[in-house]
Design a protein with these regions (language model features):
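Terminal amphipathic alpha-helical/low-complexity segments used for targeting or macromolecular assembly
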Residues: 1-62
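Left-handed beta-helix
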Residues: 66-67, 72-73, 78-87, 92-93, ...
Length: 139
């Protein structure tokens, strides 16, 4: 199984097994969305299967993250969205985003978010470089 999917699963539930994967796909809209996004990024036949599912979820769901967006290991979407992340955004490892988050740009490339960042509810990031660590990690 894809290391990215397993790291997202571990970030959400603290476990990496088949039953937890099934639970995440059924119960957690954020993890379910990320599962299909990660499958789109794999390529091959899996991408052909996952692309229409991802497109449907992106169009009719509460989460809008393009499969071309670069997202590191251990990504977590709190409360199942809603959130919007531009295709050109880059998000580091072990990042959390909460509900009503928008990461994009009015022109050009979107923001680059560093590792171990928590983005709280209703935040809109429109800048190019946002390599700030979460406030709780700044110690």
């Amino acid at each position: 199984m894809n290391e990215y999917i397993m790291s997202d699963l571990y970030r959400c539930y603290g476990k990496k097994n088949f039953m937890t994967l099934c639970r995440g796909l059924i119960e957690d809209p954020g993890f379910n969305y990320m599962f299909w996004l990660r499958m789109c990024q794999r390529g091959g036949i899996l991408k052909l299967i996952a692309l229409p599912i991802h497109k449907w979820k992106r169009t009719f769901g509460k989460i809008n993250i393009g499969y071309k967006c670069q997202i590191g290991y251990g990504f977590y979407i709190g409360h199942g969205g809603p959130c919007v992340v531009s295709d050109s955004a880059v998000i580091g490892n072990n990042c959390n985003i909460s509900q009503f988050v928008t990461i994009g740009s009015n022109e050009g490339k979107s923001a680059t978010i560093g590792n171990n960042v928590y983005i709280g509810p209703s935040v809109c990031i429109n800048w190019r470089q946002c390599n700030y660590r979460s406030w709780c990690d700044s110690g």
